[in-house]
Each structure stands twice: as structure tokens, then as C-alpha cells.
């Protein structure tokens, strides 16, 4: 479920990015031979086109309705909660929920697989290790 949300969120972000790029026009396209005019912020009471940017004009052979598309609203909605059934609602909160198969191509782990037997060590304790607990005979520690 998490990868699906990530893919969906990525599609939403790409859609938002592409829709804003269409409104702004293309970046970095200005006439290098044309001198840059200084903009005076006090004279701009109303939004005016920037003289340093190239304004994209509408071609005459393309109908207007192709440029006047309504903006789509992309909403990322979290997935609904997973309903496991009434028998799972009656369980105490610390009960282990059994293995749920999410992808059909993955086999659940078998209960009958035995762990690999381990070899027992033939090592003997070293002679200089002394037992100094309260249960050992002749213990020197007082508890």
C-alpha cells in the first residue's frame, strides 16, 4: 500500500508542476539583442507584462478552446482503513494477527520448516575462570 501511495503522490506532484509550467510559459527565452529595461517598482500599480520576457502569442491556426482548458484539481486522499472482519475486531489489542497474504505470488512461510541444527561446542571452560556467585560453594562475595 505504501508504494502505491508514493506513486500516486509522485503523479500528483508531476501534474501540479506541469500545470504551473504551462501557465508561466517557457523559461529563459528572451531576446539577447534587446537591451534589458530597468523595472521601476513604484510605477507598477497594476500587474503589467515584464518587458524582459518574451510573451507567448497564440497561433492563428489553433482554435482558442485548446488554450482555455479548466484547471484540474488534484487531491491526495489517504487510502481507506483496512477492514479485516468482525472476528478481528473482537480480539484483544495485543493478539497476534495471522499472516495476511498481500501478493499472490509470494508464498507464506511454512510452519513446518525446522531450524538448522547447530553444532555443540567441545570447548571446556578455562582453568582460571572462578565461579563467584552466591550459589557457588565457598563463595567469597557476601550478598
Curated annotation (Swiss-Prot):
InterPro entries: SMR-like. GO terms for cellular component: extracellular region. Residues 1-22 form the signal peptide. It holds the Pfam family PROL5-SMR. The keyword Signal applies. Residues 28-52, 116-143 are annotated as: Disordered. GO terms for biological process: response to toxic substance. PANTHER family: SMR1-RELATED (PTHR14179), SUBMAXILLARY GLAND ANDROGEN REGULATED PROTEIN 2 LIKE-RELATED (PTHR14179:SF14). May play a role in protection or detoxification. This is Submaxillary gland androgen-regulated protein 2, isoform delta. It comes from Mus musculus (Mouse). The lineage of its organism: Eukaryota, Metazoa, Chordata, Craniata, Vertebrata.
Amino acid at each position: 500500500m505504501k508504494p502505491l501511495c508514493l506513486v500516486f503522490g509522485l503523479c500528483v506532484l508531476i501534474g501540479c508542476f506541469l500545470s504551473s509550467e504551462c501557465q508561466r510559459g517557457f523559461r529563459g527565452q528572451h531576446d539577447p539583442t534587446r537591451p534589458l529595461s530597468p523595472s521601476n517598482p513604484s510605477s507598477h500599480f497594476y500587474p503589467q507584462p515584464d518587458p524582459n520576457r518574451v510573451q507567448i502569442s497564440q497561433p492563428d491556426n489553433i482554435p482558442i478552446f485548446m488554450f482555455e482548458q479548466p484547471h484540474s484539481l488534484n487531491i491526495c486522499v489517504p487510502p481507506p482503513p483496512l477492514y479485516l472482519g468482525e472476528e478481528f475486531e473482537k480480539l484483544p489489542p495485543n493478539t497476534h494477527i495471522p499472516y495476511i497474504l498481500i501478493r499472490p505470488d509470494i508464498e507464506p512461510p511454512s510452519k513446518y520448516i525446522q531450524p538448522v541444527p547447530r553444532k555443540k561446542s567441545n570447548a571446556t571452560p578455562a582453568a582460571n575462570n572462578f565461579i563467584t556467585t552466591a550459589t557457588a560453594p565457598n563463595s567469597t562475595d557476601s550478598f
